[in-house]
Amino acid sequence: MKVTVIEEPLLEFGKGTHICPRNGIERMGVYDTKDELRRSELRLGIVGRGEGVDKLDVWLDLCRSGIVGKESELSNLFKGFGGVSADYGFFTRLLSSPGFTRALQKSSIVKVSRIKTREERVVAAVNLYYEQVQFLAENRAIDVIICVIPEELFLSLTQKDAGSKKDTGSVEQYMEHDF
């Protein structure tokens, strides 16, 4: 058997190249900082229930402020994260506002969660969020829209239908969510 080792390519960043994405962003900024039309703000639209939106706001604050790295002999493994700010790394500000947020009613979530078949629940949930996403896209100057899915709705969308013999898997198989 013949084995060929391919050298890992250098990644391009705003002010140079580096092999590591984290180090490259930290030291040289993201690639599009070279773009003269690049915006310095990222406006976030949010669709979800109150509690989930509040948790997302806390998480976004953590993203803005940064995360301290862990002590380790492997210095590159548990590096800190400097945060998302206009002065560092991503060179942008994350902007969220109540005016960019669309709240879903609990009664609407419960109604979708009680639909008998999973397929119909998924379609109803997509339609529920789509109305609010469409409003934000058409009426606000938004760059990214984040859909916050309440746990009750998430569980109803990831569980098998009542009476179905096919199991869709456990919640643990899905990405961790806490919004």
Where does each model-flagged region fall?
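Long, low-complexity, intrinsically disordered terminal regions
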Residues: 1-179
